[in-house]
Amino acid sequence: MSNGPITRTVRQALILDLLEQNQVSSQMQLSELLKQRGVDITQGTLSRDLDELGAKKIRPNGGRAFYAVGTSEDAASSTTAGTREKLRKMLDDLLVSVDHSGNIAVLRTPPAGAPFLASFIDRVGMDEVVGTIAGDDTVFVLARDPMTGKELGEFLSQRRTSL
């Protein structure tokens, strides 16, 4: 993680990543995992982030409870408008510039922002996107035929402001 301050969107994307990779059973445990990644966070901010992300404690088959986001019940009840709004916020916070080559849109982000933006684009499941590859500050987004990389880049730039 970079040494400078991070945006709320990047912090929340990191929280999502940690919740996907670990069975986090408490806010204290999540706070420690964030600290290991260089993010110091207050309990109040962490609690708000978890609430905004829709993280809920689940206890599968009566086992140990842990935080999860996007369970099958949540996915069934989530609205397209909410997903579009989250994508707009992510693009507003992270998209610095757009370029293209062939059927690839090249998205530039601040340092450490690309993995979070790519992961979210993949999770949204846009029909226009085949998949993403992310470095530290660059995301390659592969456009689905017949769309070109230029058209996809323009589409994402427009979503940034029009949603």
Curated annotation (Swiss-Prot):
Primary residence: cytoplasm
Protein name as it appears in the record: Arginine repressor
GO cellular component term, pick one: cytoplasm
Primary gene name: argR
MF GO annotations: arginine binding; DNA binding; DNA-binding transcription factor activity
Family, as annotated: Belongs to the ArgR family.
InterPro entries named among the record's database cross-references: Arg_repress, Arg_repress_C, Arg_repress_C_sf, Arg_repress_DNA-bd, WH-like_DNA-bd_sf, WH_DNA-bd_sf
Pathway: Amino-acid biosynthesis; L-arginine biosynthesis [regulation]
Subcellular locations according to the entry: Cytoplasm
GO BP field: L-arginine biosynthetic process; protein complex oligomerization; regulation of arginine biosynthetic process
Function text: Regulates arginine biosynthesis genes.
Top-level lineage group: Bacteria
Swiss-Prot/TrEMBL keywords: Amino-acid biosynthesis, Arginine biosynthesis, Cytoplasm, DNA-binding, Repressor, Transcription, Transcription regulation
One Pfam family recorded for the sequence: Arg_repressor_C
